[in-house]
Amino acid sequence: IIYYESSRGCPFSCSYCLSSIDKKLRFRDLELVKKELQFFIDHKVPQVKFVDRTFNCKHDHAMTVWRYIKEHDNGITNFHFEVAADVLKDDEIELISDMRPGLIQLEIGVQSTNIDTITEIHRKMDFKKVVDIVTRINAGHNIHQHLDLIAGLPYEDLESFKQSFQDVYEVRPEQL
């Protein structure tokens, strides 16, 4: 696995996350990113895990990278992205839905569906929209999605965590 960063920082201010400390978002030059990705593709690296905190926070950046890996797919390399599902745009969904099965996988941080918890941790998320987007992507049967929860957040007890688990489980991600 290659851990790879095409941007640094996060546009969100979730109180539990260390990424919220750095308020600046910085993006690497896309020509350099493409050159480095091509090196990984040429060398048939099995997986490139983007560690960008919210890969799709800048639409043009995400689209350029996703187009590039689609156009240069070697049939082997898999790319992993952490995304905010509720801010994915229709053209992004269309692009990734047309990729070969296994080319990309998405990690979607839900953290909790408890509204008191979400409010307390300053998490901006529309869970209904997350459900809609995850369901749309699942329909294509080509993208592995895993959705994350965090146990122990403020206002989260065992019962509310069970509810968050059930809410996410019902969406049927490949991994929870």
Tell where the protein language model's regions lie, with residue ranges.
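Catalytic cores of alpha/beta
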Residues: 92-96, 154-170
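Radical SAM [4Fe-4S] cluster-binding motif and immediate context
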Residues: 1-139, 151
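Proline-aspartate-enriched helix->loop->beta-strand connector
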Residues: 45, 173-176
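Internal alpha/beta domain cores that form substrate/cofactor-binding pockets in large enzymes
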Residues: 145-147
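Phosphate/oxyanion-binding loops and surfaces in catalytic or ligand/nucleic-acid-binding neighborhoods
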Residues: 72, 171-174
